[in-house]
Amino acid sequence: MNSSSSHRNILVTSALPYANGPIHLGHVLEGIQTDIWVRFQKAIGNECYFFCADDTHGTPVMLAARKEGITPEQLIERVGQEHYRDLTSFGIEYDHYDSTHSKANQEISKDIYLKLKSKGHISRRSIEQSYCETDKMFLPDRFIKGTCPNCKSKDQYGDNCEVCGATYSPKDLIDSHCSLCGTSPVVKNSDHIFFKLGDFHKKDEKSTSLETINPSHLKTDFDLQSWIETSGVVSESEGVKKKLKEWFDAGLQDWDISRDGPYFGFEIPDETNKYFYVWLDAPIGYMASSKNFFEKNFPNEPNKFDSFWKNKNSEIVHFIGKDILYFHTLFWPAMLEGSDYRAPSKVHVHGFIGVNGEKMSKSRGTFIKAETFVKYLDPEHLRFYLASKLGPGMDDIDLSFEDFINKVNSDLVGNLINSVSRVSTTILDALDRTLGVVSKEGLALIEEILYQTVKFGPGEDSIQNIIKYAYDQRNYAKVLREITRLGDRVNRYVNDNAPWKLIKENPEKAREVVTVTLNASRFLAIYLYPVVPKISEQIYKLLNLQDSPSFKDLDKNRILENIKVLPYEMISKRVDEKAIKAMLEENKQSEHSKKVETSENPVPEERLEISIDDLSKVELRVGQIVEAGPVDGADKLVNVKVDLGELGIKNVFAGIKVAYQPENLKGLKVVVVANLKPRKMKFGISEAMLLASGEGESLSLFIPHKDAKPGDRLK
């Protein structure tokens, strides 16, 4: 059971946040889960590196930059800094955080592609592709929405279903439409490049490709299904194995790895206006991030990169959400093995996070951004709470704020921190803040914390080994149950000996109790270090220890005696329910403000049915923006002049600046509510309303057909 019996060399990654939105609690969950595991591996002496990067390519990034009037490079630079700031504010400590838009990533992507091509795993064929006549572009999968052809869930993307996990072609989507303008796309032919995934599954040895770029097809010895079943890469999760079996039984399809320009990404070698699909170079970002780190930090070890990515004696471990299982357990390992790299050792899959028993909701204020959480609450508290919920499977996690308050205040602050604080203030002051020696009785307590035998499954083992094993298996809930139980034992020792009484009657006996308590608490801080590193380091600082907590110090021969202890500083406060309410209220107000500024007449959340007579009262007309400018004192408003043909030019204040820069609006045709009662605002009179859909940076104005004329009425 002892996970530290032999030295391990481990490269760890968490999934890459996409560069067109803020970090929220879903990202934070994965980052914390990964960081705890990495900190544990380092604490027991393993060589372990933690890499991540921003996922920066694709049409969404390109269009988001266009709306802001900046280049994609400028956008991803800013967002990357924001992502890194938000993730590290939760104590997530990367060895290197990179961007997929890097020279190293481009070079490795090219290398992998050309090797796959030379071995016959790449094919070309003409495909029917969705094209938006309004926006004059081929539509990427994520800009097509409709009903899933597999489970019939509505509002799903063009490449995969977030409900059932199925992947498919955009043309298979039912009732598809362009998510930019809402019109139904037309179909055009375009040559695309495919990765023949079926080459890596014996059941699918015959390729379905119509034309092979390299006709000398070479077989591969790597079979995905055998690898999944025998390598243990996902052995701990029956749910994962069941889902993979479904995909194998259905047969593995060739994977389209190209996109037509315009597209923000890497051009495919020897092709014209063809770019790598973002999902090809995104996971390669793991490799590029590690390559950049190794070249900078190990200049005298040129084979450091290969010692992980080409050496199966090392470990490559991915932490991902269950929504990207297909890519990481099928496409990714096949790409690696097919290009002379090695497949991952483990793919650890976690579930989603909800808040108060429901999915995160913007309207209820529970779609919580990382930036907002740290403004009101202690990130260490979230680390502790999520760890108490995390097991080795991929079950979803619920952040119940009532439970959050109780668990943090009771188990962390009221138990594990309390054992330190209750003996470190006035009692230690009266003892010149100096520890004594550990008594025989005290040594028995410390040995209980370090070496006691505990039942585990059908057998038993030492408490240290059980905690280490649970950490290694990502069973953090088990870890915290054991540590909390030990914390109860330490607090019981303090209660039984009452040093606040002894300080008056027998100061040296009080010193002995304090010495035992702080030594016991120090060992608990070591156990806790991967979960709450800041709190553990504060306890170390109190004890005047310069090093970070390390599992090698879990030894009774490392007891601290006759040392001076620093003045006590608050380690952590209890969670205040008022802070949670304030955070949720800010979220709700922020969302409400967006809706108000987007529409002069916000639609209520409850669906309201109207009659045909009501609808006929609304006069929708085509307008053309002839002027657009900012509004002083209103960061989210744009002042536009709209030409409505015979109705003349109307003045409109529109809450669209989050998605559109004024200088990009002139000449744009829009849909206008032309007979809206003029509204007096502090900036002036707003005489109409522009129609738009979506929220935040995804907000899009409704665009009429190019031949429509200003003043035309929509019917």
Swiss-Prot record:
GO MF, one example: metal ion binding
Instruction: Report residues binding ATP.
Output: K362
Which branch of life, at top level?
Bacteria
Where along this sequence does the record place binding of Zn(2+)?
Answer: C148, C151, C161, C164
Q: Where in the cell is it found?
A: Cytoplasm
Q: Which Pfam families match?
A: Anticodon_3, tRNA-synt_1g, tRNA_bind
Per UniProt, the short sequence motif 'HIGH' region occupies residue numbers 17-27
Q: Which InterPro entries match?
A: aa-tRNA-synth_I_CS, Anticodon_Met, Met-tRNA-synth_bsu_C, Met-tRNA_ligase_1, Met-tRNA_synth, Methionyl/Leucyl_tRNA_Synth, MetRS_core, MetRS_Zn
What this chain does, per the entry, is described as: Is required not only for elongation of protein synthesis but also for the initiation of all mRNA translation through initiator tRNA(fMet) aminoacylation.
Q: What is this protein called?
A: Methionine--tRNA ligase
User: What is the native source organism of this protein?
Assistant: Leptospira interrogans serogroup Icterohaemorrhagiae serovar Lai (strain 56601)
Q: Which gene encodes it?
A: metG
